[in-house]
Regions:
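Conserved alpha-helical "signature site"
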Residues: 1-155
């Protein structure tokens, strides 16, 4: 019952990403906080991406999720991303923080780490975002991550 509920909430592609994340955590004996950080980044990127092109929207969740891969494997992110079958745009967004998806990810990471002073106002305006957008996206990410955590506890 909770699995079908999860599929309704997340969609099948998100379930695959989430299952991979959970598996990584169990295999590598990583703290729950890493899973939370990964999901928070993914959902915050997803929420903010609605102001962007369809291409950015499609990559944003994955970019947020993949941006913590180095912590999961204790290996440099750039090396890990080279071996994954990903588009150059997604790879560059995660590793180099280039393109709109990369810039979005950069802002999300800084916001989540309370590095607000390192988010240039002109970068936000170029992306068409405001601090209120970031705050709303953060609240959204918390709510979605909490939903996932509750589903995991039910299992």
């Amino acid at each position: 019952d909770s699995i079908s509920h999860a599929v309704m909430i997340l969609g099948i592609n998100r379930i695959r990403s989430w299952a991979t994340l959970v598996s990584l955590g169990k295999l590598n004996h990583k703290p729950d906080e890493l899973q939370t950080e990964s999901l928070m980044r993914a959902y915050m990127c997803e929420n903010l991406s609605t102001k962007f092109s369809a291409e950015v929207q499609q990559m944003s969740f994955s970019a947020g999720l993949l941006s913590c891969l180095d912590a999961w494997f204790d290996y440099p992110l750039e090396q890990l991303m080279k071996v994954l079958p990903l588009s150059h745009e997604l790879r560059d967004a995660v590793v180099l923080k280039t393109g709109e998806t990369g810039q979005l990810l950069s802002v999300v990471v800084k916001y989540m780490h309370s590095q607000w002073d390192q988010i240039p106002a002109n970068q936000l305006s170029e992306l068409g975002l405001t601090l209120a957008d970031l705050s709303d996206a953060y609240a959204y990410a918390i709510a979605r991550t909490d939903q996932i955590s509750e589903l995991m506890i039910e299992e």
